[in-house]
């Protein structure tokens, strides 16, 4: 029996693998520049639970945060533009959608005098993209709203906004602006005057510093960064958004069911509260409630809802970078007080609950970015950005899998996707087909809609697909049951999605034939040969050379010799 062994070598160091690891694909971008991947180039990797690199994408511009995998196998990549209009840690500015074959389907820039994308994005189920942007405000605009001081030589105050992009036409179809939800208690001569503690749904414009003379994450110069949002996540069931503010040491939830007009006000949407905050947690002193004991979060990153089907579903999980001190971090989980209507009750004069949280892991620290994602089997995938260390722990905190490359790298965040993530129906499956540098004997193990070799094997060399009849024939499409030569410039893996091929009937000519099998391995003893035309011992595959085989593996093709024309069945 022919054994297939694929060796893919990158500059990596995998140190541990356990049987309890969640079987799936880890996606992350690895870069060498400060700021969690910003600056120079980077490489995005899709790696399976056996630590095999399934696919990689090279980028000329470094990552702003983590990439996102779509069910069609393309990725959404937020990256740093060369000359951002506003610059601080986590700066981005560009968002691309890149196919499995490395084609850029679209590329949008959000870097101008008004808006500058930074950190995270969030792909939505409808295909749109939520984008975090700084929104530039002058010192005078801030003073006119009651701000008392500006803490940077730019004389700017960068507010925040969330824009929803329809990538099919480049239009912004929904937006939320933090500037529409301010309060101040300085004077009734300014707008939004009120008692801060009576309005936890609003942001106190005088809370926190408005920028600095220099920023974290790469030694940026003067900036007007006030909130430093760094993560965004969407809850489909609630139609709500959660964001994380490092400089406020808080997370915030708002309603996404509003219109843009409602999002600018204080009424409308499922909550009836417009774009006001539905919930906030981490530092209630920001809205003049609670005390130092209630100040839990510090410079946190990576907040996200735990998905349905995973332990803790509906809870929030995040990486608390400064947990108790500026040199120790932790991954924590919290159960929000959300009710059946998607609202978050709060008592008068009290901070939002919960009073306590679930400690997931506390033996970790990273100054920049970082994140955590719960897996369906109960494990948690954690990323230490500074040390480029991704590791998966079980409920007892024991490491089940880890990735830590040698060299000076950073990884903003990583997340995993299940093996069944790619586009599938009840009748379809996804298969990984490995290939080596040079010529390979390949076959099509599934019924597919698009038979083009450029689509099925996008990393193959153009014009190198050949079948064999009475001689070699150049082809552009693959058919089930037929074998082909195809050339590749590098080792790798292709992912093919389609429906099962349970049985085949193949017509053969006298002499040598090039064939392929079904979705499942085919034992030669189970091949039907009613005419007795197969010459014994003449099934050959190709690896480093020709090899006699006993089993036809899916996705590969084989030579077989016959004594005459006829039909065989699997």
Regions found by a protein language model. Give the residues of each.
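Short alpha-helical patches at coil-to-helix transitions and adjacent helical residues
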Residues: 14-16, 225, 555
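Sec-dependent N-terminal signal peptides
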Residues: 4-15
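Structural motif marking the loop-to-transmembrane transition
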Residues: 2-4, 114, 484
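Short, surface-exposed loop and linker segments with low hydrophobicity and enrichment for Pro/Ser/Thr
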Residues: 15-24, 232, 457-460, 528-532
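Histidine-/acidic-rich catalytic cores in large beta-rich domains
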Residues: 19-427
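N-terminal exported-region signature
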Residues: 426-570
């Amino acid at each position: 029996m022919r054994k297939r062994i694929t060796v893919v070598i990158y500059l990596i160091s995998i140190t541990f693998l356990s049987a309890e690891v969640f079987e799936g694909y880890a996606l992350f971008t690895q870069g060498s520049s400060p700021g969690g991947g910003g600056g120079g180039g980077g490489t995005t990797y899709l790696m399976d639970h056996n630590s095999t690199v399934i696919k990689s994408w090279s980028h000329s511009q470094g990552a702003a945060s983590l990439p996102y995998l779509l069910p069609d196998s393309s990725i959404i990549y937020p990256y740093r533009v060369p000359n951002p209009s506003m610059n601080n840690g986590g700066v981005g500015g560009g968002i691309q959608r890149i196919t499995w074959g490395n084609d850029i389907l679209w590329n949008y820039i959000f870097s101008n005098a008004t808006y500058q994308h930074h950190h995270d994005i969030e792909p939505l189920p409808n295909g749109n993209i939520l984008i975090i942007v700084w929104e530039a405000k002058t010192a005078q605009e801030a003073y006119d709203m009651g701000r008392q001081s500006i803490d940077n030589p730019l004389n700017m105050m960068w507010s925040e906004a969330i824009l929803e992009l329809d990538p099919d036409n480049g239009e912004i179809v929904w937006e939320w602006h933090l500037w529409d939800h301010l309060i101040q208690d300085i004077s009734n001569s300014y707008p939004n005057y009120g008692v801060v503690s009576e309005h936890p749904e609003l942001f106190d414009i005088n809370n926190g510093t408005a920028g600095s003379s220099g920023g974290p994450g790469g030694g940026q110069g003067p900036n007007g960064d006030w909130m430093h949002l760094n993560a965004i996540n969407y809850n489909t069931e609630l139609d709500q958004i959660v964001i994380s503010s490092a400089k406020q040491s808080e997370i915030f939830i708002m309603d996404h069911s509003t219109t843009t007009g409602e999002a600018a006000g204080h009424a409308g949407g499922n909550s009836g509260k417009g774009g006001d905050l539905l919930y906030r947690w981490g530092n209630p002193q920001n809205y003049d409630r609670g005390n130092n004991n209630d100040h839990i979060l510090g410079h946190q990153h990576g907040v996200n809802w735990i998905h349905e089907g995973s332990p803790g579903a509906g809870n929030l999980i995040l990486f608390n970078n400064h947990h108790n001190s500026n040199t120790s971090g932790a991954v924590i989980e919290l159960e929000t007080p959300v009710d059946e209507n998607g609202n978050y009750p709060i008592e008068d004069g009290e901070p939002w609950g919960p009073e306590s949280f679930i400690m997931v892991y506390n033996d970790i620290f990273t100054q920049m970015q970082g994140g955590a994602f719960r897996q369906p089997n109960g494990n948690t995938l954690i990323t230490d950005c500074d040390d480029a260390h991704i590791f998966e722990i079980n409920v007892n905190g024991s490491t089940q899998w880890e990735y830590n490359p040698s060299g000076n790298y950073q990884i903003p965040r990583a997340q995993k996707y299940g093996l069944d993530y790619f586009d599938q129906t009840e009748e379809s499956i996804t298969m990984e087909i490995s290939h080596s540098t040079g010529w390979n004997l390949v076959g099509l193990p599934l019924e597919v809609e698009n038979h083009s070799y450029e689509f099925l094997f996008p990393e193959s060399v153009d014009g190198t697909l050949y079948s064999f009849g009475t001689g070699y024939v150049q082809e552009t499409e693959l058919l089930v049951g037929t074998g082909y030569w195809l050339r590749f410039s590098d080792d790798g893996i292709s992912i093919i999605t389609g429906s099962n091929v349970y049985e085949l009937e193949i017509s053969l000519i006298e002499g040598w034939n090039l064939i392929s099998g079904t979705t499942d391995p085919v034992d030669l003893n189970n091949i039907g040969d009613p005419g007795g035309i197969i010459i014994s011992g003449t099934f050959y595959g190709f690896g480093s050379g020709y090899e006699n085989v006993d089993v036809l593996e899916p996705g590969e093709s084989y030579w077989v010799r016959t004594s005459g024309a006829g039909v065989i069945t699997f």
